[in-house]
């Protein structure tokens, strides 16, 4: 299912977060995207510290852009990544979930979004988001966890499905033969798929 990356990268870190850089040409990009079989969009911010002001800015920006994307007929993936090396990762997740819920409740009844979130410290932590009527799907990003750790965490969070890139490519090398490369890819797909089925 095709998704279009629409963000222009991250701004400098302030208030414990990195918001997205401005996207002045987003409407033009989305109008061009209508010519292709694109289902939705993706855009990433990063949270490092449990800063109430910083996390509110991240979530507000993500939802503001998401509404713009919905108005053009696409499904937005909202991706406020919590850095896995944060010393206060769970505290970040508590603030993030509360702010996402507030913004979901403000969406029009006929609007839905997808959420792409870092695997949480607490098992089943995002169940309330998974069950929310304005959320189409909650997908998990590996965020730098090893494939094994990411899959283990995913198994403890039923309802989330994998959207791993870093964990997926773990073990791949240009020095591998075609068979070794294909075998590594197959093993990665199998492991991640099984973890998503729990």
Q: What are the roles of these predicted feature ranges?
A:
Residues 75-76, 137:
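Short, proline-centered helix/strand-breaking motifs
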Residues 28-31, 57-71, 94-103, 124, ...:
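Alpha-helical scaffolding segments of alpha/beta enzyme cores, especially the outer helices
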Residues 109-198:
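Catalytic-face loop-and-helix region of soluble metabolic enzyme cores
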Residues 5-11, 44-48, 79-85, 116-122, ...:
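Active-site beta-loop-alpha junctions enriched in small/polar residues
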Residues 1, 27-37, 67-73, 105-108, ...:
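Acidic (Asp/Glu)-rich catalytic clusters
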Residues 48-61, 88-90, 94, 120-130, ...:
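Active-site-adjacent beta->alpha loops and helix N-cap segments on the catalytic face
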Residues 5, 42-44, 54, 88-121, ...:
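Catalytic beta/alpha-barrel core
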Residues 1-57:
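Active-site beta->alpha loop and helix N-cap motifs at the rims of alpha/beta catalytic domains
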């Amino acid at each position: 299912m095709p998704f279009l990356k629409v963000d222009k990268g991250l701004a400098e870190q302030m208030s414990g977060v990195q918001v997205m850089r401005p996207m002045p040409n987003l409407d033009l990009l989305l109008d061009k995207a209508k010519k292709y079989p694109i289902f939705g969009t993706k855009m990433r911010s990063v949270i490092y510290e449990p800063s109430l002001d910083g996390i509110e800015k991240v979530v507000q920006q993500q939802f503001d852009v998401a509404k713009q994307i919905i108005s053009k007929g696409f499904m937005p993936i909202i991706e406020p990544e919590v850095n896995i090396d944060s010393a206060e990762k769970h505290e970040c997740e508590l603030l993030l979930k509360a702010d996402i819920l507030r913004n979901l409740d403000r969406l029009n009844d006929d609007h839905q979004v997808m959420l792409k979130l870092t695997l949480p410290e607490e098992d089943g932590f995002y169940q309330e988001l998974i069950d929310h009527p304005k959320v189409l799907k909650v997908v998990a990003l590996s965020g730098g966890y090893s494939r094994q750790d990411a899959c283990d965490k995913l198994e403890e969070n039923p309802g989330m499905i994998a959207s791993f890139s870093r964990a997926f490519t773990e073990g791949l090398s240009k020095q591998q033969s075609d068979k070794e490369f294909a075998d590594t890819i197959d093993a990665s797909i199998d492991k991640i798929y099984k973890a998503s089925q729990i």
